[in-house]
């Protein structure tokens, strides 16, 4: 009885000799009902990687079969179809994006009690009641939808003592502001 180790199909293809007696592991014959399928690996004789003296030495002690599993999870066609969310069609997302992009440049007024702390040399700025300009809709990046928690980028101008008019940008949710001119 010879010791065997398991190889990935790519490695086995690179080192396999035409006369080697490889067999598929048991995971290749079992069908899974889960969306993730397992790609089987090849079990190759240990003699491909070790010298005969090491095999004889190891087999004289105790004959144990060593198999290393190297199954790789891959997505099946069912899982790819299951990933597509049937409730949100691409056309509705495109409509939402087009609607938001059409509003860029509009004047907005902040309705929620918000404070920002990222204006230079000012401890905090209260945004409630301030008017600004909608600069960008950032929930879509390079044509793909991203999970932006605050998708609207709004530019504000505020008069600060000793500094004059200061421009800063803040990201807000849709329910935190209202459109002044539509």
Curated annotation (Swiss-Prot):
An example Gene Ontology CC term for this record: chloroplast
Keywords: Chloroplast, Oxidoreductase, Plastid, Transit peptide
Key word Plastid present: yes
One GO BP annotation of this record: photosynthesis
Pfam assignment, any one: FeThRed_A
Entry's family note: Belongs to the ferredoxin thioredoxin reductase alpha subunit family.
Summary of the function given for this chain in its UniProt record: Variable subunit of the ferredoxin-thioredoxin reductase (FTR), which catalyzes the two-electron reduction of thioredoxins by the electrons provided by reduced ferredoxin.
Protein's recorded name: Ferredoxin-thioredoxin reductase subunit A1, chloroplastic
């Amino acid at each position: 009885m010879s010791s065997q180790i398991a190889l990935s199909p790519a490695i086995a293809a690179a080192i396999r000799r035409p006369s080697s007696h490889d067999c598929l592991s048991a995971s290749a014959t079992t069908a899974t009902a889960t969306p993730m399928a397992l790609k089987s690996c090849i079990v190759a004789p240990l003699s491909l990687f070790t010298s005969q003296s090491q095999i004889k030495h190891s087999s004289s002690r105790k004959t144990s079969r060593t198999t290393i599993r190297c199954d790789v999870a891959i997505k099946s066609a069912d899982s790819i179809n299951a990933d597509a969310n049937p409730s949100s069609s691409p056309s509705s997302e495109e409509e939402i994006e087009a609607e938001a992009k059409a509003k860029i440049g509009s004047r907005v007024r902040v309705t929620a009690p918000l404070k920002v702390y990222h204006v230079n040399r000012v401890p905090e700025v209260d945004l409630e009641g301030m008017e600004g300009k909608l600069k960008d809709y950032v929930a879509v990046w390079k044509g793909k939808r991203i999970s932006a928690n605050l998708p609207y980028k709004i530019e504000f101008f505020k008069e600060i003592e000793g500094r004059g008019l200061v421009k800063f940008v803040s990201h807000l949710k849709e329910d935190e502001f209202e459109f002044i001119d539509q």
